[in-house]
Amino acid sequence: MFDNIKEFFRTIFKSRLLVAATVMVLLFSVLIFRMFQLQIIKGAEYQDNYTLKIVRERTLNSTRGNILDRNGEVLAYNELAYSITIEDNGSYDSTKEKNKLLNAEIADIITALEKNGDDIINNFKITVNDNGNYEFTVSGSSLKRFLADVFGQASYSDLKYDKKLGYNQAEATADQVMDYLKVTRFGISEDYAENMAYKITVVRYAMSENSYQKYIATTIASDVSEESVAYVSENTSKLQGVEVIDDTIRKYNDAEYFASIIGYTGKISTEEYESLSADNDNYTLNDVVGKAGIEQVMDASLQGTKGYEKLYVDYLGKAVEVLEREEPSAGNDVYLSIDKNLQIAAYDLLEQEIAGIVYSNIESSGSEMNIPITDVYFALVNNNVIDIEHFSDEKATENEKAVMHIFSGRQQTVLSSVTSELEGASPAAFGSLGEEDQDYFTYIINQLKEKKILLQKSIDKTDEVYQEWQSGTISAQEYLNHAIAQNWIDITQFTIDEKYSDSTEIYDALCDYIMDDIATDTGFSKIIYLYLIKAGSVSGKQLCLILYDQGVLAYDAEEISSLESNAVSPVSFLKDKIRNIEITPAQLALDPCSGSCVITDVKTGELLALVSYPGYDNNRLANTVDADYFASLNTDLSKPLYNYATQERTAPGSTFKMVSSVAGLATGVITPTTQIMDKGVYENISNHPRCWALNHGYTHGLINVSEALRDSCNYFFYDVGYRLATNNFSTSYDDATGISKIQEYASLLGLDETTGVEIEENDPQIADEYPVMAAIGQSNNNYATIQLGRYVSAIANDGNVYEYTLLSKVCDSDGNTLETYEPKVRNTVDVLDTTQWNAIHTGMRMVVEKLSTFNDFPIEVAGKTGTAQQSPNRPNHALFVGYAPYSDPEISIATRIAFGYTSHNAAEYAKNVFSYYFGVQDAEELLNGQAENVGESSNSFND
């Protein structure tokens, strides 16, 4: 047996398998030992070493520079805040898995943010309107760029018909874009509520804009609460690519006063990125840039220089060690020429003046264009001071519910009436309808045009049926049926089934669309409210109480009780609120509701104030755009986003007469002593224009140029225009000759081009026809207030026309001056001698001496009033230009109150500004927050 065992082992040791087996055992042992060493003994160390091999470089944003006034008062600055960013750095097996996980993560973040009172950043170009429908927030080239980006094309011209989608990408509606993004690109499940799906789309689209740039995180929320910071920190292990970062947000002091100058910041758009990165490759699609005003113009200087850091990150993308870091450098500080205190005072005084005009014309028997109280009531609804959508909210008050009940009943009646007119056998001709029904159908047709269902470009204006519609002799039913027959209707814009094959069925589908649309359309509802208010079905008392219900007015138990008990009438109540500017002219958006003022240092040409009323709160547009607020600004009838000082142009009225004086004196057609007899009616031209004084039963008699300015004598300046057109009666009358002379001297006074101010400014328009009418500021003269400001400043300083600037200097973050700015003399008006200049100055001084508002005013002021009519159905524009002190001018002023009734109101406002500037009256007395006691409210021409 022993021999057998011995033989067995001898056989094994002689076998080749033994060698192989031994080698296998040894190798396996080494492998086991190595795995034990890797995973157990040095597992953590090797894991760290592996993790640290992932190196990334990221940009460190610089701190934006401040914007300050001429005296160093801070107007725009930065405030430290926390932001939340997300970067798609996960690993996925499929696009489907990526969408599912990423969408779920974003939904969780949104839910947590909203629970903590925070919101996502929403710069998406589609919003949800008041009717719950998707709509674009941009138009024109911005919309084209957005559509190209959505469908992944380099330009709008590359968009084409997509068979799979079933529509032309270039003509995609907001609904189609949303469906494409949600379903096709981002795979957002139908399980999400519509509102959540929209918000996920907003975030995913923002992330997609950075997708081509490696390691660029997308900021999805800024200035978040401590609770949201804690949420991210506590859930860091499951929030892939999500971080809380130290950030800054842009803040603006005294926002409404300076927003029209400073503008605001926001996330860079694709168009802005393409433009800015062409000159500076440091820009990224996650940058914050200036979007308007000085913020935009001086963006490169305010931006500063970015830094960077190289760091190791772990598998979750979290930084674990910084390898290299270069600190960013702060942006430069920009100083404006504007005086903060003067700007604020001029704005508040302007609001007080406009409020006074509105107050004095409500139910005024002395006003030629009084404001009916029902117009005031409706203004609360029409300009969204009162939110009519809240009437149907579950939290609506009893007052709101009562009004909603009245509205609902009337709405059903109106909709039935509209249906009858559209579908009935005997529709009425438009002209035979009552005013209310005409308003409804006018709105319906206009909406069809606006939504490009009724194609304006396709309409044949010579078509007989179209002309009958225009004259009101056919019904809307006949007109729309004819429009379908003529292919003026785009049926692809509204839902139509295959069963709608002929024109009758298409018309039925169009009617269904119209009725569905107006049933929820806010604009249509407002027309219903208008007539309910006019009829007294919705009372002023109800609307006044709703102002308290909705928090428009601060709760006041005593005033509410007085309204409820009829101790105070709604008319008195509202007038009191307007007088105290608790309800502002801008909120009502009645005539007048806007104005502007430009104040210049006449010796240096520096702009000291550039006021546009109303303003807006640019804090709500910077950083994270308040979408609801931005939408409200765009629909606000007082147009707060419009700069009335630099963009609004109207006829200058009689403020232009100094141009005609310069032209007449410089060409020699008049001298300072030339006298012209005012005969009332100017007979030398065919339209026989009249001097305004004749309407009051008198003429100005024999007067010279100074007296003509004093009296604002139209006849005198008609004759100056005629003399310019006839070379002082030496040749026959020639329009071109006369107008070229007026253009020459208007240009010499700076009225031929923009002033040079850095922000948006519309081009001036010197009249190019009818020199006789142009000489009094009519014809087609049109100027912005800032252009009149430069012009009157040149008059005040005897001919120096300045190139304006809003800037004073730029300093680095340490206060070192890098660049200075000062107005440059564009040209000098050297065509008049001292005697001629004095004749103009004397006339302007006499203008002010004649104005009752300047009685006993201790500062000598020179100026010129102007009244311009834009529409016979609306009040006149009120203008005033002037300077002070008369003997040694320091500042000039140009002001316009659009639809301000009479130039007396503009002059009164200018006096108050001079009073503030020169300290004539205590600032607290002037700026008392009360509507100005307007002494003149007639809508007449006295200049």
Residue ranges and their predicted role:
Residues 34, 72, 106-108, 232, ...:
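Active-site SXXK
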Residues 594, 689-695, 729-772:
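Mid-domain, small-residue-enriched loop/turn segments at the edges of structured enzyme/sensor domains
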Residues 332-338, 589-595, 628-656, 672-679, ...:
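Short active-site loop at a secondary-structure junction
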Residues 74, 604-607, 801, 817:
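Hydrophobic "anchor" residues
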